Amino acid sequence: MSDTHDMTALVLFSGGQDSTTCLAWALDRFARIETIGFDYGQRHAIELDCRARLLDGLAQLRPEWAGKLGDGHTLEIPTLSAISETALTRDVAIEMGADGLPNTFVPGRNLVFLTFAAALAYRRGISHIVGGMCETDYSGYPDCRDETIKALQGALSLGMARPFELHTPLMWLSKAATWQLAYDLGGRDLVDLIRDQSHTCYLGERGARHDWGYGCGACPACDLRARGWHEYIAGSAQS
C-alpha cells in the first residue's frame, strides 16, 4: 500500500463491529476520512442509528481522530431489498439455502455498495475506499472474497478512468483478531466502544446485553461475534 498519510479515504461505515474497526484503522492511516452508509431496507437498520454514537466516541477517544473526521453520507437504495428475498430484508427464519449459502446473503450487495461508494468518491476527489469485507470468518458470501474485491477494483478503475484502491484490512483476520486489531488501534477504550455501541445482530435486537455486546445471541452474526470475543478474551488472559 502506498503512503496514505496525506490522503483522504471513504470508509463504508454501517455501524457494525467490522466497519467501526475499519474506520479506526483508516483514521490511523489517512489524513482525512469521509464515511458512507446504506439504507437498503435491512431488518437490522438499527445499525445505522449506532453510527452517530460511534463517531462521537471515536472523536473523544483521540483528539487527532476528531480532526480527521469529515462528511458522513447515507444513501438509500430500496431497490436492493425489492429484488432480494433474503432473511436480511424479509421477516423470515435464517436458514441455509440449496446452494450452500445462508439466506442472509443479499446477492450483489457489496458490489452495489462499492460501486456507489466509488461513484461518490469520484465526485469527492477520493481514490481510497475502505471496506470491512472478510474471507476468514464469513458465511461463504462470494462478494466478500478477496478475488471479488480485486476484480471490482479493476473494473471500477477502468469504468471511471480513475485508479481506485479498495482497502480491506480485515480480509484475512478472524473475528478474534478483529477484536485484537481494535485493541491495537485504540486500546481498551476502543474495544469497549465497539462492544457497547456497534451493532451486528441480523435481527436488529438491541435489548439484551451480553459480554460481547447487544444482540439476540442466536443468529449467525451474534454467534460469530460472541465466539470471536471469547477467543479474544482467552488470548488476552494468556498474554
UniProtKB/Swiss-Prot annotation:
Binding site for ATP: F13, S14, G15, G16, Q17, D18, S19, T20, T21, C22, L23
Enzyme class of the recorded protein, top EC level: ligase
InterPro entries assigned: QueC (IPR018317), Rossmann-like_a/b/a_fold (IPR014729)
Reactions mediated catalytically: 7-carboxy-7-deazaguanine + NH4(+) + ATP = 7-cyano-7-deazaguanine + ADP + phosphate + H2O + H(+)
NCBIfam families: 7-cyano-7-deazaguanine synthase QueC
Pathway linked to the protein: Purine metabolism; 7-cyano-7-deazaguanine biosynthesis
Function: Catalyzes the ATP-dependent conversion of 7-carboxy-7-deazaguanine (CDG) to 7-cyano-7-deazaguanine (preQ(0)).
Cofactor(s) recorded in Swiss-Prot or TrEMBL: Zn(2+)
Domain of life: Bacteria
Keywords of the record: ATP-binding, Ligase, Metal-binding, Nucleotide-binding, Queuosine biosynthesis, Zinc
Molecular function (Gene Ontology), one example: ATP binding
Organism: Bradyrhizobium sp. (strain BTAi1 / ATCC BAA-1182)
Residues annotated for Zn(2+) binding in this entry: C201, C216, C219, C222
Record-level GO BP terms: queuosine biosynthetic process
Cofactor: binding comment: Binds 1 zinc ion per subunit.
EC number: 6.3.4.20
Protein name: 7-cyano-7-deazaguanine synthase
Family, per entry: Belongs to the QueC family.
